[in-house]
Structures are given as C-alpha cells and as structure tokens.
C-alpha cells in the first residue's frame, strides 16, 4: 500500500510538473572545478537559499554547495502537502530519495530504539519535506534569546520585520467548511513580503473541528493568530502552501522563481572549510566526483543544518579540541560547545476510531486515493492539500496536572517565560501509534484520529559529534530525549490531557468505542510513560548545536551576528545557530535569521 500511494500520487505530480514546466531551470548549475566567489554557502536549504538569494540580489557573486538536487525530479510527490508523512516515520525504511537518512541509535529515552531522523537532502532542504506549519515565537521567548546573546536586536518587535520579509500571506479560501474558518491577523504580514507563500489548505480536516470544540470545553481559548507574538490557545494554523495550486512552498520553489546571478554545485559534498595562517576562512574543499576548491573572497557561510553544520566545523578543526585530536585533525579553534546543547521536540499520543473522514482512508481505499489525487492535480483541491495536522493548540499545564511535580520539576519549568507554553497539541487526522511508518501502519477498516502531545519546553539536551574526519560518514546523533525527570513528568501530563480531550462531551458524537491505542488498561503514570518511551518520535526540530551567545560563554559557538568565535570570515546561519529553540515550529525563525544576517552582511560588510 505504501508503494501504491507513492506511485499514484507521484504520477499525478510528475505529469503536473511536465505540463506546468515548473522546474526552476534558471539556476546556474556548475560542475567540479576550482572557482572564486564573494560568498560560498554550504547548504541549499531553508536558510542557505534565503541568504544566498538576498546576497545575489545585491550583485555579490554567490556559490551554493548542495549535496542533493531538485526535489521536483528526485521525489516530486513532496510537492503534495498530503504526502508529507510518507517519509517521516521512525523506521529508517521510510527514508525518501530527498532524505539524508540520519538515525539516532539506541536512544535511551525511547527504550533504546533506533530512530530515523528525516532531514532534507535537496535544494530547499527540510522546507521541501516538513509539515509546513508556519507560526512565530512568543514575545518573551525572543526576549530570552536577546538576553542570552546580549543583543536587543533579537527582541520580537525588532525581528518582526525580518519574519515578514520572506513571506507573502493569502487569507483562507471561502471554500473551506463554515466551521473551519481560521482567525488571522493580516497586519502580522507585509504586502511587500516575498517570496515564500503562507496560507491555509483549501480543505480542512473534519476531525479538527471537533478538536476545536473539545479544547474550548477544557478551558483553552481560541487564539486570534499565532504570528504576532502570542502562542497560547488554539486555532487552525497557517502553512507554507501555495494557495493557487495547493502545493508546497519551499525555499527552493519560492526563491528560484526570480532570475539571479548565483551558482549552484549540486550533488556536491563540502569536505572541509579552508583557512589561512591568520585563521581566516578562505574557501571550501568540495567533492563532486573529484575534489576542488571554491574560494571565498569575503566569507564562507555554513547552512548545513543542526547535524551537519557542527560536523563540518569539527572536521575543519573547530570544536572540542579532544575531538580534533582523536581524529588527527589540526585544531583551528577550541570551541567545546560545537555539537552540544541540542534542543528538540518529541511527540506521542492516543488514537481512537472516529465517525468522520480522516487520512486513514487514503491508505485503505485506492479509489478514494485516486479521486483525491485527481482533485489535487486538476484544481489544487481536496484532502491532499492538507498535511493532516491543521489544528494547533498551546498551553502551560493547568495546576491539576502539576500536582505530582517536585519542587525541582517546577523550578525547571520556571526558567521558561510566562508566555512560553509547555505543551503543544496537534489534531492528527490519522492513526499515530508508534509512527514507525505513518501510512503502512494505518488500520485497514474504519477511520482513525489522534491527538498528539508535543514537548515544547524540554529540559533534556542532546549532542552531535563526528565518527571520522570525513563528512561522508554520518554524524553521531544523541538526542537524549526524556533524560530528565521533568520531561518525563510533562510528557505523562500531556498524554493525560490528550486523553481528556477525547473524553469531552464535545467529542462524544464522533468517538466510536474505547481508546484504540494504546488502550485504557495503560492508566498509571509508569504505564503511560512506558507507552511514551515505546512510541515517541521527534517532530524534527533539532537545533542549537552551534549556539549563538556571548564571548564569555565557553559553550557559545557564534556571536549575535552569526560569526564563529576564534576565526574570521566564517558564519553559521541555520537552526543550529539558535541559542534556544523557541516554542512551536521553527521554520519561520530560520527564515527570519537568514534575512537578519543577510542584512547585517549587506550593511556592515564582511
């Protein structure tokens, strides 16, 4: 069934692509050979393409080194929002052609399971494969960011123009169900913002309308919007979706729509950052069949993501000195924080059989799948315009949920500002289970839905390191999920809250039978925690592994202008650069950071 879904939808997408001539051929593609540019950017993902485009717009000569190619050719199905779960499972066998295929091995907090960690390996990076949710951090979370890096330019009101710069907002279509009209604040966006498209799916999940009522019943308020600095409450969420045709809007599809003088090295692997005797970054050693050098007369910018940005630094001699010495790498800068401080969000949740249509039907009924693929292909309509998780809620846990928390647990949570939620809930119009393979594991009879709990104020921290001096060898990823007692307590409380939502009077008309998964026999805190450990999955928000900070912080890797400490001519611009992972979904913040640093470079030079 998994292959059938991929085959049918891929066929429609590929035909659609051929007809629309949508492939961005205006990219200047170059093959192996020494060359010189003003800026060399490693990674053509969410941040990399954004900063490359802004610099190219100012007539700088920019090269982008990308290990993948066009996702439209490698895996065209990813253009369809409803397909995003296909490659997102915990089982590495769900890996797609545009996925690096990282695996966090024997994760202790997940009962020593090996967990597949999807990351985009293509132009567009993870913006080409994520679940597309677009919302911004809270005001006080950005105040904490500004405090940690000692730079008021990161206060919410000061970064808001950079959030607005990348995106163009379209209000929801009137074709949605009457009870699924999203609230939004149009002033949170700029009419001049371009080119990433932010809107709403034309189709709203029916289950989400029932979750909305249940959230009201347990005391959460509907939010006006999640893009003006407040996250508490619940609403239909905005997404990076092209409203006209119902397709994904990625950094590649967005920024490639305009002609620019930039150069791309595709299917090319950055092997090492090169330095002169003054520890100035002078270029990048690249492999694309043969090795060659791209010289940067101004700067090298690393935008390789939370796993490979620290990896590239370490193999280049920047990182903990003991790591360099272990693998015979010359030490350029001893920065012990490289690869440390990894933040992430994990999810889990119960599932019920329900009396409304859900995505389960796509996996069990080929004719329905075919009809929906046709609806998407011919008009950008139908269920495939929706990635399934279109309703979002955030809260700080109520006092009753904290009754079993120790003083230490409460102190841990007190670090987070008052507008920083502890838990996020997603209305999942699908069976979640252990998320090993989101489509293959769907029940074959009936419709199923889940309420997913997500830790968005985690205390546990992971790390990333290298296994050799070669970037071709996958980095070692140790996420350390649920390492702390506080994270365990919050997880159990969130699971109980998800169950409470299913038990509301509001939800009763659509619930069929008892809890399908894991089953109400799992009721004690220890039993629920064991279910969580056996089933939890990352929601793909790894960050902070090259954290921004002040020079007196030994664990800081870059300053507030994204410049790497201990060297010159080198910056890191992606989610690894975050000092903290703000609550919610980070793609908006990655775009913001890339816009902000691009302006810094343009104004202040290198």
Q: Where are the language model's segments positioned?
A:
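N-terminal redox-cofactor-binding region of secreted/periplasmic oxidoreductases
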Residues: 2-606
């Amino acid at each position: 069934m998994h292959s059938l879904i991929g085959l049918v939808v891929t066929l429609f997408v590929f035909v659609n692509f051929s007809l629309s001539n949508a492939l961005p051929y205006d990219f200047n593609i170059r093959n192996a050979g020494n060359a010189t540019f003003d800026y060399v950017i490693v990674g053509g993902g969410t941040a990399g393409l954004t900063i490359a485009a802004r610099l190219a717009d100012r007539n700088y000569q920019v090269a982008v080194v990308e290990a993948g190619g066009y996702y439209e050719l490698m895996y065209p199905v990813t253009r369809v929002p409803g397909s995003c779960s296909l490659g997102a499972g915990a089982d590495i066998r769900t890996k797609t052609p545009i996925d690096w295929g990282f695996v966090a091995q024997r994760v202790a907090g997940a009962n020593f399971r090996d967990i597949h960690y999807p990351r985009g390996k293509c132009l567009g990076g993870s913006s080409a494969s994520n679940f597309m949710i677009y919302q911004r951090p809270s005001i006080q979370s950005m105040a904490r960011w500004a405090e940690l890096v000692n730079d008021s330019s990161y206060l919410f009101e000061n970064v808001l123009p950079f959030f607005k710069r990348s995106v163009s907002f379209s209000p929801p279509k009137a074709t949605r169900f009457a009870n699924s009209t999203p609230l939004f604040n149009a002033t949170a966006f700029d009419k001049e913002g371009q080119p990433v498209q932010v809107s709403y799916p034309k189709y709203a999940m029916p289950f989400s309308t029932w979750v909305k009522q249940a959230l009201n019943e347990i005391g959460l308020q509907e939010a006006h919007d999640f893009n003006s600095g407040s996250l508490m409450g619940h609403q239909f969420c905005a997404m990076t979706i092209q409203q006209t045709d119902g397709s994904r809007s990625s950094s590649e599809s967005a920024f490639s729509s305009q002609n620019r003088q930039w150069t791309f090295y595709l299917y090319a692997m950055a092997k090492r950052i090169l330095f002169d005797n003054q520890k100035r970054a002078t270029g990048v050693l690249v492999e694309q069949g043969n090795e060659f050098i791209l010289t940067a007369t101004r700067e090298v910018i690393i935008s390789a993501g939370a796993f490979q940005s620290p990896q590239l630094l370490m193999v280049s001699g920047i990182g903990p000195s003991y790591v360099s010495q272990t693998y015979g790498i010359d030490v350029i800068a001893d920065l012990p924080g490289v690869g440390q401080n990894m933040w992430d969000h994990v999810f889990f949740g119960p599932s019920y059989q329900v009396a409304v249509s859900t995505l389960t039907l796509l996996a069990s009924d080929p004719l329905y799948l075919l009809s929906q693929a046709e609806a998407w292909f011919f008009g950008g309509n139908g269920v495939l315009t929706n990635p399934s998780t279109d309703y979002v809620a955030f809260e700080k846990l109520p006092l009753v949920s904290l009754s079993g928390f120790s003083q230490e647990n409460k102190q841990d949570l007190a670090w987070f500002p008052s507008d920083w939620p502890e838990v996020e809930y997603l209305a999942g119009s699908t069976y979640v289970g252990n998320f090993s393979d989101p489509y293959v594991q769907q029940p074959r009879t009936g419709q199923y839905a889940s309420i997913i709990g997500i830790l968005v104020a985690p205390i546990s921290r992971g790390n990333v390191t290298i296994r050799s001096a070669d970037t071709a060898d996958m980095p070692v990823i140790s996420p350390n999920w649920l390492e702390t007692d506080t994270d365990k307590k919050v997880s159990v409380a969130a699971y109980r809250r998800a169950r409470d939502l299913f038990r509301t009077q509001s939800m009763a008309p659509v619930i069929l039978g008892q809890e399908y998964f894991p089953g109400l026999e799992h009721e004690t805190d220890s039993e629920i925690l064991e279910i969580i450990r056996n089933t939890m999955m990352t929601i793909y928000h790894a960050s902070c592994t090259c954290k921004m900070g002040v020079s007196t912080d030994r664990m800081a890797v870059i300053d507030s202008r994204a410049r790497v400490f201990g060297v010159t001519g080198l910056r890191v611009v992606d989610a690894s650069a975050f000092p903290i992972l703000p609550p919610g979904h980070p793609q908006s913040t990655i775009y913001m950071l890339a816009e902000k640093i691009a302006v810094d470079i343009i104004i202040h030079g290198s």
